[in-house]
Amino acid sequence: MTQVAKKILVTCALPYANGSIHLGHMLEHIQADIWVRYQRMRGNQVYFICADDAHGTPIMLKAQQMGVAPEQMIADMSQEHQTDFAGFNISYDNYHSTHSEENRELSELIYTRLKENGFIKNRTISQLYDPEKGMFLPDRFVKGTCPNCKSPDQYGDNCEVCSATYSPTELIEPKSVVSGATPVLRDSEHFFFDLPEFSAMLQAWTRSGALQEQVANKMQEWFDSGLQQWDISRDAPYFGFEIPGAPGKYFYVWLDAPIGYMGSFKNLCDKRGDIDFDAFWQKDSDAELYHFIGKDIVYFHSLFWPAMLEGSQFRKPTNLFVHGYVTVNGAKMSKSRGTFIKASTWLQHLDADSLRYYYAAKLSSRIDDIDLNLEDFVQRVNADIVNKVVNLASRNAGFINKRFAGQLSAELADPALYQTFIDASTSIAQAWSSREFSRAVREIMALADAANRYVDEQAPWVVAKQEGRDADLQAICSMGINLFRVLMTWLKPVMPSLAERAEAFLNQPLTWDGIEQPLLNHNIAAFKALYNRIEMDKVNGLIAASKEDTAAAQPAVTGPLADDPLQETISFDDFAKVDMRIALIENAELVDGSDKLLRLTLDIGGEKRNVFSGIRAAYPDPALLVGRLTVMVANLAPRKMRFGLSEGMVMAAGPGGKDIFLLSPDSGAQPGQQVK
């Protein structure tokens, strides 16, 4: 039965235009591209778009440091990003920029509608201001002495020595990172989006059943803690769009960034002339809209974005497809270890299809982190693609080319086996469609094993030596070629370059519907190597090329001690005053109004403590901490913060930011036990 083609618009999160694409970015773009290519193979009308996120203070300041205009910097970065994505065969229909006229017009339209509908509120807030640069300073653009441990050179939101969190106004001797000047406190009127007004709508959307369970659960936590109004404005100087009717005020980057999805699509519509923008974005649109995003930006896409769309009379997303992070060899990507790998560096040493396949073999519809184990990567690609799939073609093509002038047999040697492959297409299609990529790969490789068993059992190399069995030889090898064709059709969304070479060899396009009709009495091309085995030397070269060049510096001391020297010696009596206890993390949640803090509820053996900890960058999904044991300083004097009372401090190691690691006791430790 012929299905009606769907109209689908697919986006990936917009890469920020101040840095290169790395393998963490590539997980999302590969995942989305596989899904898009599959949908296209099934006859659906799919538009796949992206853009660079090109606004904000970091871009403005980096351009100043480089001595170029922000417009030039983001244009250069856009070209680099597009080259990287093209190298990985990401099949975008359009790649644009948030710094565009389309995005400006749509941002102003959405803001104006929100304001007219009463969803924009004004109020005055106090911020640190750089008198030399004439600009308000974000938290990370202020440094000073920690008010808690008195360590110098700490950021304006948390101390990387003692992990204390605070507001920039609490810093001792604060200085502007931009100019070195002493900032002053200054009031400014800001504009806020009234997110709480959309709480009922958002909760209904959450309960619709479309969202991933993990996303819906996290959203419910946010609803339970209460939604807050969202500051959508920034003061000049700022690289972005000025707010209509508010000179010197600019849209915060996170307002116009998701509107960039619309801007990129509008740009495509205008260039093509045959796509109706409103058919995809109007309130009653029957098109499907999907955003592939990382778990670190769920808050913006599940709350702010649908609320903004609802309040401005546009349609909401059909769904969010959220993925986890990428680790390499079991750890966070590291420049010093050579595992912080840029997309361009990968392509200088290895092919794109290999990474696409490995990611597909590990991806599911859940929000799980993916580990790129480089040794396993080599073994898996060689075992699956070289030894199973490509070898199936090579071991049969030689006989067909040499003995039968490239012509396949008129009949299938084993129709029942071929029917098994046809029947499997339904399950594999469902796996691709539901983003259960690892299941699809497992099923495909199981059938690749079955195909190779067939060839092993039929032993064409033996049949070739037997008189009068030419017809059997042709039928056996033709069967092998046909099974290879089906396998490659299933893998076409994952490995487009290999699929293209397979199509040239088969003299036939690989189409999903074509699986049901085997190639009979058909001429294939002379066989050429379709895919080369990956050698570990290539991977070692990739790692070496990715390492930071630290040899020139030749520091006397390297490692953590160089960055954080030992403190002055203290007496045992002083140490004995510190009461450290094992604590069970009963609950962990984001803190509204802070992009650095987590609120932890700790059980220390019958007593509950509320602790604010500046570890959000390292643990962006706090739900993963629930149930863990950690170590806390239990007799630290409670500290009143603007978010509440913090009743202790959890212990963590690392330089700070994303590179901080919560301490955990060995198995057997119990909440409340003293650390001695």
From Swiss-Prot:
GO terms assigned for molecular function: ATP binding; metal ion binding; methionine-tRNA ligase activity; tRNA binding
Gene3D superfamilies, per the entry: HUPs, Isoleucyl-tRNA Synthetase, Domain 1, Methionyl-tRNA synthetase, Zn-domain, Nucleic acid-binding proteins
Predominant subcellular localization, coarse grouping: cytoplasm
Keyword presence, Manganese: no
EC numbers on record: 6.1.1.10
Short motif ('KMSKS' region): ranges: 332-336
Ranges spanned by the short sequence motif 'HIGH' region, renumbered to the chain: 15-25
Pfam family, one: tRNA-synt_1g
Keyword Aminoacyl-tRNA synthetase recorded: yes
Matches recorded under PANTHER family: METHIONINE--TRNA LIGASE, METHIONINE--TRNA LIGASE, CYTOPLASMIC
Similarity comment text for this entry: Belongs to the class-I aminoacyl-tRNA synthetase family. MetG type 1 subfamily.
Purpose: Is required not only for elongation of protein synthesis but also for the initiation of all mRNA translation through initiator tRNA(fMet) aminoacylation.
Name of protein: Methionine--tRNA ligase
Lineage: Bacteria, Pseudomonadati, Pseudomonadota, Gammaproteobacteria, Enterobacterales
Gene: metG
